[in-house]
Design a protein with these regions (language model features):
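Short beta-strand/loop motif that positions the catalytic acidic residue
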Residues: 189, 195-197
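Active-site nucleophile elbow and catalytic-triad environment of alpha/beta-hydrolase enzymes
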Residues: 170-185
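Catalytic active-site module of serine/aspartate enzymes centered on a nucleophile-bearing elbow/loop
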Residues: 219-220, 225-266
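Flexible "cap/lid" loop of the alpha/beta hydrolase fold
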Residues: 99-107, 112-147
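Conserved acidic catalytic loop of the alpha/beta-hydrolase fold
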Residues: 71-89
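Acidic catalytic loop of the alpha/beta-hydrolase fold
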Residues: 200-204
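Short alpha-helix in the alpha/beta-hydrolase fold that links the catalytic acid
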Residues: 191, 205-214
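Conserved HGGG/HGGXW glycine-rich cap/lid loop of the alpha/beta-hydrolase fold
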Residues: 9-62
Length: 319
């Protein structure tokens, strides 16, 4: 797995496919290859997929003594996409990754072509205590031995088999204390947005997901029936069809947002060059790809053909 230096970290990542860039952010204690295993084969046909390991996860080493803060994950993402040369991109986040995605969207909405978040609430409520209990290593040892073994394998690389024992309490300490996003914050998120949740999610009540989708300027909601927190893996057909349909429906807007940002960047570069002549730089390269910058075009034709998407599970609800 390659790495790139960003925000003081060697961020490990997976990359698949070719096309407009799509960044996928995994949940706490997980990895992109696990959370999005059912999405990678399908969406790599039309997009260049980037799946970075969050700090302390997988192969992205992290100084446990420094602590863990959710806003640092936003800084990490910003540094990662800058280092990758991704001016604009599609962004999908799950759980912890969804919070990172939302906070990045507040900070830099103009960078996003579209936004999709799964299993996320922007409200403080009692269910955060559920997450905190799950992040207790002593409880995990006693009640979840299979999960403990998996965590050891998942986060062992370069950090030691017990790395997760430092990671869980660090994440738990920041759950419920990170700043809440306000209605004003959410109104800044102007790219087309999809909010997805399961109707049996132990962490996110449906009314919270519904409220989030209503507060986003261009939001829509997917509710997965009979599903808990991990909509992408528990209802992959439903989620894949909904996400592919979302990309089809917003393709023109997404392309326009990418072009608008490119024009602004070119104008800023021209103004800088005219005010202070400098040597012409070498052609920009994408350090993640090792060759050319990620494509900035529109979605590939397969998105117009629903037969390419996995068949949806019966009974999905969108609003």
């Amino acid at each position: 797995m390659p790495t790139i230096r960003a925000n003081g970290l060697d961020i490990a990542y997976d990359v698949h496919g070719a096309g407009p860039p799509l960044v996928l952010l995994h949940g706490a204690t997980s990895l992109g290859a696990k959370d999005f295993a059912a999405q990678i084969p399908l969406f790599a046909r039309a997009f260049r997929l980037y799946l970075p390991d969050a700090r302390g996860h997988g192969r992205t080493r992290w100084d446990a003594a420094a602590g863990f803060r959710y806003d640092w994950l936003v800084d990490d993402l910003a540094a990662f996409v800058d280092a990758a040369g991704l001016e604009t991109f599609h962004l999908v986040g799950f759980s912890m990754g969804a919070l990172t995605a939302l906070q990045f969207a507040v900070r830099s909405p103009e960078r996003l072509r579209t936004l999709a978040v799964v299993g996320i609430s922007t409200q403080r409520e009692p269910r955060t205590s559920v997450a905190r209990r799950l992040m207790d290593p002593v409880r995990a040892d006693r009640e979840e031995p299979a999960w403990v073994a998996e965590l050891g394998r998942r986060h062992d690389a370069g950090q030691g088999v017990d790395a997760w024992r430092r990671l869980l309490p660090a994440i738990a300490a920041d759950i419920g204390v990170q700043p809440l996003l306000t209605p004003r914050d959410l109104r800044r998120i102007d790219p087309p947005a999809l909010v997805a949740c399961g109707d049996r999610d132990s962490f996110v009540p449906i009314d919270h997901a519904w409220g989030l989708s209503r507060q986003l300027p261009d939001g829509r909601l997917l509710v997965a029936p009979g599903c808990g927190h991990e909509v992408m893996s528990r209802k992959p057909g439903l989620f894949n069809e909904a996400l592919a349909g979302f990309f089809r429906a917003t393709a023109a807007v997404a392309a326009a947002r990418g072009e608008a940002h490119s024009r602004m960047s070119r104008a800023a570069s021209t103004q800088t060059a005219s005010s202070a002549p400098i040597a012409t730089p070498a052609a920009e390269r994408n350090p993640l790809d090792g060759d050319t910058p990620a494509p900035s075009g529109t979605d590939s034709d397969w998105l117009a053909d629903p037969d390419h998407a996995a068949a949806p599970d019966p009974g999905g609800a969108t609003r």
